[in-house]
Amino acid sequence: MLTETVAGRTYDYSHNVGRGSATGMGFANPVALALDADGAVYVVNRGGESISNVPWDRTGVGARISKVSLGSQAGEEEYLSEFSRYGSAPGQLIWPAGVVVDAQGHVYVTDEWLNRVSVFDKEGNFLSCWSTLQSGDSEPNGAAGIAIDAHNTLYVTDGRSHKVRKFTTDGTCLGSWGRLGSGPGELDSPWGITVDDEGYVYVADFKNHRVQKYTSNGEFVAQIGSPGTKRASLSNPTDVAVDPDGDVYICTWNKNAWDRGRIQIFDPEGHFLTGLMGDAQQLSMWAEMTVAANTDYLKRRREVRSTEPEWTFAQPTAVAFDVANSRLLVADTQRSRIQIYNKLSNYLVPQMNL
């Protein structure tokens, strides 16, 4: 539904932004989101690989960082710029996975394949990069999610070594926690990560089908969600966000034909509130431009019985909360768009029956 009120909270679908594009105005498998102080959104495009039948011509398509303004309603979105591209040279990306922006506007991007963090300024100029590998690592760690706290400490999840590592912004490792397992505090392929206003760290524990909450030093605090088939369950959570009220938003993959992913919402105590499955009933402005430029495409769209299947999420991978505008941003990965929900306060439910 477009508007849902639960436990004093109202989530109201706003609009969506995006279309499939390997460059420029659009996205290519967006997998991470971050906002800067000016309200611009940095989108990590995982892209794809174009692999010919010869080993020396293996190239990637679409891997980059897009910078966009989402606007307050449909039609106000604006493509601002993009930077980086596929490759292993300094400033380039192969498997970009996470992004965060610090108070100075510096953009930090993790790369699972290269096991490093690349740093850019807000204009996209490359500044530096540093490895997430540490002495004693026996294999690549798969740097995935990244978050930053109020003290400028970076937290990076290692999907292959099942850890969370702490770094300074120049790459000095401050410590780590976690090991492979399913017990309290243990991890199995951690992915998305965030830090709340009180400094607690939340980790999307992908293969354990839960989110875990820690202190900034890695002490286990609580588990949010659990695996299963019930409405409140989690299935392969990929990312997590927390709003100023303490409500927790968990991005999940559900691998079945009728439910290809959703956002599960919990209150600060970990009680399930509701789930969002996507409501993009209208094409984005950019997608409308694509349709308008291709009359055959428009004809075929008018021939389908219903476009309802494309309204919902398809393997959403990232979620972020825009505090300044009190709204939730969801990277609808396989549909190459961002769906946006406003969190409303003092919403008055109409007193009528329809």
Give the location of each predicted region:
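Eukaryotic scaffold repeat domains enriched in small/polar residues
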Residues: 1-354
